[in-house]
């Protein structure tokens, strides 16, 4: 079981001394329609009336980013080549909020014409008109959090969608011109079996998605499921969570199946057809700079002067 994360704070890391001309931008949208049983992310169920206030604060932070960077003595490239809206459930935002957010982003930063702009979305939770607003704003990649194509597993975990809804969303996204897609799966959901995992892998491959993310379930102690596991209880089907060994075998099977289907593993949890790897995700692995804005977001930016390396303690040398 994973230990609770430290309190969120903005961090600045030395990401190398070479000049970087482009920035990645991560924007946290922490709103959900329901909270998954295993989730301990900085997100929650809030009334729609708070969405606009939150977006206003994010826009303030975008407008103040240059001044903050100058005060912190870090380089903040104005050119942006990747944007990622994570959550939470960013597709809960009303169309006008999506438009306002991207208008402000473009006022403060110079987006490349071919920038990769990703939005995380929960199936079946697009506010009316939001999909059209996303396309109009330039969103060209969507990460759809299916987690399972077996309805009983999804519902047990607190998800609100069905396999049919995932299929409907994929059709509507493609009709809107967004065909650079990722689909998330989680290995280790309560009640998951070898057979049901194969069914989810079959369904994922059948979608033709050019990218997939496969995560092994990690249960935070402070999540509802984590507290139930610690108490030895049965709520949220805690007794049906697969063993660590079973989860590892599911993950290994996913690697085998996805690579056979043409989705090559390019980091621990991500698989893609050649040339369709997530550019924003690669930014993290390549230690390239990014600015995080919003609740629980962090940044990694190059110091204007190289940061001194800490002295090694002789007792540990």
Where in this protein do the model-derived segments appear?
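C-terminal scaffold of the Radical SAM
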Residues: 9-23, 43-71, 76-317
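N-proximal helix/coil linker or "cap" segments that precede and/or mark the start of modular domains
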Residues: 1-6
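Local cysteine-cluster metal-coordination motifs and their immediate loop/turn environment
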Residues: 30-43
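Short active-site neighborhood of thiol/selenol oxidoreductases, capturing the structured segment around
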Residues: 25-28
């Amino acid at each position: 079981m994973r230990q609770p994360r430290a309190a969120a704070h903005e961090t600045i890391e030395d990401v190398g001394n070479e000049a970087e001309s482009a920035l990645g931008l991560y924007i946290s949208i922490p709103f959900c329609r329901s909270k998954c049983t295993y989730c301990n992310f900085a997100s929650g169920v809030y009334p729609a009336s708070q969405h606009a206030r939150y977006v206003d604060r994010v826009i303030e932070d975008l407008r103040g980013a240059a001044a903050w960077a100058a005060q912190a003595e870090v380089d903040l490239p104005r050119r942006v080549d990747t944007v990622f809206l994570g959550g939470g459930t960013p597709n809960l935002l009303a169309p006008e909020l999506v438009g306002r957010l991207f208008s402000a982003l473009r006022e403060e930063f110079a987006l490349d014409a071919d920038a990769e702009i990703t939005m995380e979305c929960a199936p079946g939770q697009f506010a009316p008109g939001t999909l059209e607003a996303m396309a109009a704003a330039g969103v060209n990649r969507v990460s759809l959090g299916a987690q399972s194509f077996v309805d009983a597993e999804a519902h047990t975990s607190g998800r609100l969608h069905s396999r049919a809804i995932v299929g409907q969303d994929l059709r509507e996204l493609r009709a809107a011109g967004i065909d650079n897609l990722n689909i998330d799966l989680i290995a280790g959901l309560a009640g998951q079996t070898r057979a049901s995992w194969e069914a989810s892998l079959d369904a994922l491959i059948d979608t033709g998605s050019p990218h997939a993310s496969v995560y092994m379930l990690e249960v935070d102690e402070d999540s509802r499921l984590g507290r139930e596991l610690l108490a030895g209880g049965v709520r949220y089907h805690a007794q049906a969570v697969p063993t660590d060994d079973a989860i590892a075998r599911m993950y290994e099977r996913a690697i085998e199946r996805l690579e056979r289907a043409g989705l090559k593993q390019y980091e621990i949890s991500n698989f893609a057809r050649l040339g369709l790897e997530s550019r924003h995700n690669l930014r993290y692995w390549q230690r390239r700079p990014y600015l995080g804005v919003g609740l629980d977001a962090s940044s990694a930016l190059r110091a204007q002067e190289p940061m001194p390396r800490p002295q090694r303690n002789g007792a540990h040398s």
